[in-house]
Curated annotation (Swiss-Prot):
Coiled coil: none annotated. Pfam families: CLN3. The gene is BTN1. Involved in vacuolar transport and vacuole pH homeostasis. Also required for cytokinesis. This is Protein BTN1. It is found in: Vacuole membrane. Residues 1-31 form the signal peptide. It comes from the Eukaryota.
Length: 387
C-alpha cells in the first residue's frame, strides 16, 4: 500500500515538474527561430528568466497569502496565454508571451517545491526528474517537429498550448494521496497553518530577510554559480560552437544549436532523475566542475582547437549532468538537513538561486555571444551569422 502511494506521489510530481518547465525549455530551444541569427540568443533568455526571478525574489513576502488551490488556475492561464503569444512570431507579441510563461514557471516552481515539504523525498525526486524530463521532452520534441517533420514554427509552438491543463491533476492529490495518514493533509486553509507560514506573517519582513541570509552560503551561492556558468555556455557560447556544415550531420546551422540544447537537457534529465543516488554534501564541487566546462567551451569558440563536433556534443551532455546533479542535491540536502518548521519556507526561497544565476548569465551573454561571433568572423569563421 505504501509502495503504491510512493509511486503515485512520484508520478504526480513528475508530471508537475514536466509541465511547469516544458514551455521554458521550448522557448529557449526556439530562441534562434524567435529572434533570428542576427540578435543574441540571450535576449530570449533574459525575457525567459527575469519575470521568474522577480516573482521568486518577492514570493517569500506574499506567497503565504495564496492557497495552493488558487495558484493552479493562475499557472494554467499564464502558461497558455504565454505560449499562444509566442507562437505569433511577432517579436512585440513574442516578448510579452515569454514574460507570461516565465511568471508561470517561477511561481510554479515555488508552489510545487513547497508542496514537497508535505509529501517528502519521493515528491522531490519526482519533481526533479520531471523538470529534467521537461528539458529532454521539450527540446527533443521541438527538434522533432521543426527539424525532422519540418512543421512550421507557429504550428509547432501552438501544439504546446494545451499542456498546462495537466496541472488540474493537482486537485486529485487529496483523494489519491493525502487522504492517507502517511501524509500531512493539505485540506486546511494555508493561512491557518501553525507552521512556517504563520511565522512569516507574525515575524515581519526584517525577520524574513534574516532567515534568507542564512541560506546564502550553504545553498544559494553554489546553485547560483552553477546556473551562471551553464547558461553562459548554453546561450552565450553554444551559439558560436559551430563547424563547417558539410562536416556535420546537419542541414542548417540552427539545427546545431537546437541539438546542443537537446543534449544538454538529456544530461539534466538523467542526473535529476538518478542524481540523488550519489549524494553530494559540498555543493561547491558542482560550481568548480561547471566553471571548467565554461572555460573549455570558451577556448573552443575563440581558438577553434578541435574541428570535431562530436567532442563538443559530449561536453554539452556532460554539462547537463553537472547542472542537474547540482539542483537535485541542493534540494535533497534541504529536505535532510533543515528543521521541518523551516523547510517549506527554505524550499520556496532557495528556488530563487537558479533564476539569479541564469539572469546574470543572460546579461553577460548579450555581450559575450556577439563578441565571440565578431572574433570568429574576423578569423574566417562566419558560421555564427548563417542559418
Amino acid at each position: 500500500m505504501e509502495l503504491d502511494r510512493d509511486k503515485k506521489t512520484f508520478a504526480y510530481f513528475w508530471l508537475f515538474g514536466l509541465i511547469n518547465n516544458i514551455l521554458y525549455v521550448v522557448i529557449l530551444s526556439a530562441a534562434s527561430d524567435i529572434i533570428g541569427p542576427s540578435l543574441p540568443k540571450s535576449i530570449v533568455l533574459l525575457f525567459d528568466i527575469m519575470p521568474s526571478f522577480l516573482i521568486k525574489l518577492s514570493a517569500p513576502f506574499f506567497v503565504h497569502s495564496i492557497h495552493y488551490d488558487k495558484r493552479i488556475p493562475i499557472l494554467i492561464l499564464l502558461s497558455m496565454l504565454g505560449i499562444i503569444l509566442v507562437s505569433t512570431r511577432s517579436l512585440w507579441l513574442c516578448l510579452p508571451g515569454i514574460v507570461l510563461a516565465s511568471l508561470s514557471s517561477g511561481f510554479g516552481e515555488i508552489t510545487f517545491l513547497q508542496l514537497t515539504h508535505f509529501f517528502g523525498s519521493k515528491s522531490l525526486t519526482g519533481w526533479s526528474s520531471g523538470t529534467g524530463g521537461a528539458g529532454i521532452v521539450g527540446s527533443f520534441s521541438y527538434l522533432l517537429l521543426t527539424t525532422v517533420f519540418r512543421l512550421n514554427i507557429q504550428l509547432s509552438l501552438l501544439l504546446y498550448a494545451a499542456l498546462p491543463l495537466i496541472f488540474l491533476l493537482y486537485y486529485k492529490i487529496n483523494d489519491s494521496i493525502v487522504s492517507s495518514q502517511v501524509y500531512q493533509s493539505l485540506d486546511m486553509p494555508i493561512d491557518s497553518s501553525d507552521g512556517p507560514i504563520e511565522l512569516l506573517k507574525s515575524n515581519g519582513w526584517v525577520d524574513i530577510v534574516k532567515r534568507l541570509s542564512k541560506l546564502v552560503i550553504p545553498y544559494m551561492i553554489p546553485l547560483s554559480t552553477v546556473y551562471l556558468f551553464e547558461y553562459l555556455i548554453n546561450q552565450g557560447v553554444a551559439p558560436t560552437l559551430l563547424f563547417p556544415i558539410d562536416t556535420t550531420p546537419f542541414v542548417k546551422y540552427r539545427d546545431i544549436y537546437v541539438t546542443y540544447g537537446t543534449l544538454y537537457q538529456l544530461g539534466v534529465f538523467i542526473s535529476r532523475t538518478w542524481g540523488h543516488k550519489l549524494p553530494v554534501k559540498n555543493l561547491y564541487l558542482f560550481s568548480v566542475l561547471q566553471l571548467i566546462n565554461l572555460l573549455i567551451t570558451l577556448s573552443q569558440s575563440y581558438y577553434y582547437w578541435t574541428d570535431s563536433i562530436s567532442w563538443i556534443m559530449v561536453l554539452i551532455f556532460y554539462e547537463g549532468l553537472i547542472g542537474g546533479s547540482s539542483y537535485v542535491n541542493c534540494f535533497m540536502n534541504i529536505l535532510k538537513d533543515v528543521d521541518p518548521n523551516e523547510r517549506e519556507f527554505v524550499l520556496g526561497s532557495v528556488s530563487i538561486s537558479d533564476s539569479l544565476g541564469t539572469l546574470i548569465a543572460a546579461f553577460l551573454g548579450i555581450i559575450l555571444e556577439p563578441s565571440l561571433c565578431k572574433h570568429q568572423i574576423g578569423t574566417g569563421r562566419p558560421w555564427c551569422r548563417m542559418e
